[in-house]
Amino acid sequence: MAEKTDPTKEPRAVAVNVLKGGFGKSTTAINLARELADRNGRVLLVDLDDNGHTTFNLGYRDQYESDNHVQQVLLDDADPLENVVQVTDNLDLFPSHEDLEEVETNLKSAMASSQRLGRNIVDPLLGDTYSYIVVDTPANRGKLNDNALFATKNLIVPLRPESGWESGITQTNKRLIQEARQYFDLELLALVPTDLSERLDQDTRDRNLLYAINSRDELASFVPNFAHLSAADWEAIDAGDYTGDLPGIRHRASIDKAHRARKPLRDYDAECDQLGCYEELAQIVENGGVVR
């Protein structure tokens, strides 16, 4: 497959992060990375989440349970390229490992402990080897999360319409974004409503999530176009006159089935109507933010 690298695009790394589990981080990271690979040159997906969902969902359980390659690369300076596996023609994976808690502990006593991912993976590989690097992060604070934010300096936050989504974004902002910004520039690229399925003309969790992020000035500019709703759109929804696409990444059986098939969505169901959302996420990473 020919690489579709655009020399005008700036290589960029991005972390997919929210301080709450079960909010679609792995699904978002996998399909964002796959769309970046489809649109550009080579892309690296790094799984730093100790639960290993990204690694499992792409079929690399053996690497998760083998020698601790994450320890070897981040702390012992092993060659990261010797520990990546190929997912598709242009997409590689640096898998997670079952002993990431040990890596977390050892990082606490290491020199430059928050710079290891940047120094050993992102900085040497971004640009020359990979056009983009996507990092799936843990759902809790710690050195691995610090490494992901410091190395990428760009953040995408997925949100599911479940109880606790608001505390998830509040804690992510307070305990990750604002704290990190005391030490380095960290850009929030997008807030991504995902796995939506309910009606919007009734008092549902989907509606509450979409209304909150679209109506708050401090959040609205980070909402992708596929989830953006104007005041006029809400009036049309309540009047039963809305004719636009349903906003957000919608729940689709093929997304879940792709995980069970150990494939990104594009490689499992190239006709899925939600691929356009992941493609826009890729454009947001390419552009460095949402463009209305």
Q: PLM features: residue spans?
A:
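P-loop NTP-binding core
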Residues: 1-292
